[in-house]
Structures are given as C-alpha cells and as structure tokens.
A protein has these predicted regions:
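The conserved Walker
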Residues: 50
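Conserved nucleotide-sensing/catalytic segment adjacent to the nucleotide-binding pocket
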Residues: 63-115
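C-terminal accessory "lid"/substrate-recognition subdomains
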Residues: 2-32, 156-200
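Short glycine-/polar-rich loops that comprise or flank the Walker A/P-loop
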Residues: 64, 90-93, 119-124, 170-173, ...
Length: 200
C-alpha cells in the first residue's frame, strides 16, 4: 500500500495548504456566538510515518463526508477549530493531515491540541505506522526518496522520522499499523474508528 494522493475533482472537499493560502480565519477572540452543544464540531488529526497511509486514511475520511485539509501546519489547528465553533461556519467535521514536513512545530503540538479542545471541538489524533521493512519496501517500489533521508538511505530517513514522531505516537487516540493492510483494509479500519467514536 503506497501513501499516494489521489487526484481531486473540482467538486471534492479535499484542500491542500497551497490551495488555501491566504487563509482567512476569524480571530479566536472575536465576539461570535458558540455552536450549541448538540452541534459540537469534530476534528480528526491524521499524522504518522511517511509511507504508512496518511493520504489513504484521508481519502477514507473524505468518502465519509469529512472536510479534509492536507499538509496543515499544526499552529493553524486552533484557528481552524475556532472557525468551526462559530454559528454559520458550515464545517462541523474536519480532518487535518499533519506530516513531518511541519516538524519545526511539533515541539508545540500539545499546546495547539489543548487550545483546540478549549475551543469546544471534539478532537482525535490518529497515528499511522508500519514496520521499517514495510516502509522501506513501499518507498523502493514507488521509487520515491524518503522526505528526511537527505544524502542517506531510506532507512536513515525512517529512523530520523521515528525519533521526531515518537512523542505523538505515544499520545495518539488511535494507532493504526498498516504493515499488513491493503488500501481497502485501511479504509475499513478508518470507518470502524469513526463509527465507534460516533456511537459513544
């Protein structure tokens, strides 16, 4: 299973960061009425190892009618949740894909997560993982370099990424190991997680 991004039609709900700049988001201290508790918005943050299936998980969420934002810097999470909790925002279920390319912000990630929850948003963190051997095989079969390998090997990049993301994996609400998953297995697992949380 490769972590590839499928093309999006003009009617799709997928938004990449470059598609949303400049982003006009209401300031968090604006005097806007909160969303009633019965309509409390939901946010899913998708992160994890490169090649583990982040984009496939995002596709599954999009198929479940979630609004998906790709490549979101973590510091924008509180502003997005603030937008969601205002009446008339129109977005009540949002999935944000955060990857290691935003690594300079991960040291502050827990603070951003706390602010999102303080804004009145139900937030869940899903971490995608796979074994080193599987990740190496996926990168080699796709003939793409690992984003962190530099002049080293794919395995060097994977080891560096594990060091950067180890803390996030430890605090994730759900960890999905896709080592033995097909694309359909991952989509089914994401559907199960969303359905389970909705029933609680």
């Amino acid at each position: 299973m490769h972590d590839e991004r499928r093309p999006q039609s003009s009617s799709g709900k997928r938004q990449r960061l470059q598609d949303t700049v400049p982003i006009e988001i209401p300031a968090l201290d604006e005097a806007t009425p909160p969303v009633p508790p019965a309509e409390r918005p939901e946010m899913i943050i998708v992160t994890g190892m490169s090649g583990a299936g982040r984009s496939r998980a995002a596709n599954a969420l999009e198929d479940l009618d979630w609004y998906v934002v790709d490549n979101l810097p973590p510091q924008l999470l509180p502003a997005l949740s603030g937008m969601m909790t205002t009446v008339g925002a129109g977005v009540h279920r949002l999935a944000a894909v955060v990857d290691v390319r935003s690594r300079e912000f991960f040291s502050h990630f827990m603070d951003y997560l706390r602010k999102v929850r303080n804004n009145g948003t139900d937030v869940r963190l899903i971490f995608l993982d796979a074994s080193d051997a599987v990740l190496v095989r996926r990168f080699e079969s796709s003939r793409r370099p690992h984003p962190l390998q530099g002049s080293g090997s794919v395995l060097d990049g994977i080891e560096h990424e594990r060091t950067l993301l180890g803390g996030l994996r430890g605090v994730a609400d759900s960890v999905i190991d896709t080592s033995n998953y097909s694309v359909h297995d991952l989509a089914r697992r994401v559907r199960e997680l969303v359905a389970h949380e909705s029933d609680l």
